Amino acid sequence: LERHHAPVVRDVKSHGMNPFSWPIGDYTGGRGIGWAISTQYFSDEIWKDDFYGDMRNANHNFVRKFAVHNKEYAKLYGDTIDTQNPPVGVTVPSRPLYAYQSKCTTPYNHPEGLYSNAKTYALNSGAGATYTDQYMFRLAETYLLRAEAYLELNDKDKAAADINVIRDRAHAKPVLSSQVTLDYILDERMRELGVEERRRITLMRMGKLYDRVMKCNPYYAKEMEKHYELWPIPYKEIEANRGAVLEQNPGYE
């Protein structure tokens, strides 16, 4: 996760200088290389209603402000770089710099053997993996699944109550029953389960893959098609099904 989800701050250049050392096991993201850049919808849009109150969006959880390592740069241009107000020469989002969720790494807490200099938190070339325990089941997700079921039964009061168990823990504003929709639940899943859930499986289960990609992810929206809501059936499975005709899913040949 760290390798894919954290930015490659090594490549940040501003005023002809690099503000950061790399790889460092702090909130700059360890040994990230920026393959999975957060969308603007994920890093900004879904937090707008409670940007500063929701603990899940605090800077130690969703990192937007990065402490500068280069003392000369800090002296001239400031000791932090903010993705919401990037300095001269820095494009956000791009692989070198974007807002990311710190749970993809272990700031200041990498395994001892990965430090080339433990005092400065400099990492060696063997770093890049994630060493936090990964969740298989989450109570929060159980509440969100039940909220989804209540919504399907048109019981928005109970759906809101389940969502608010999670939001209360995160010190976020409670949601009103009138605000609960399937899209709201999907947003709450992003806020709570970002970098954790198998998002495509969730969206395909709900029949919302196409709609959400078109709404939230302009990069993939360019080539998104409706029939991607289902996977193609492997030809060998169709061929092996001799008892009856197994039709390929629409849109695939």
Each model region followed by its residue ranges:
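Flexible, polar/acidic helix-loop-strand segments at domain edges
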Residues: 1, 9, 25-138
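Long, intrinsically disordered, low-complexity segments
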Residues: 1-26, 126-136, 167, 172-253
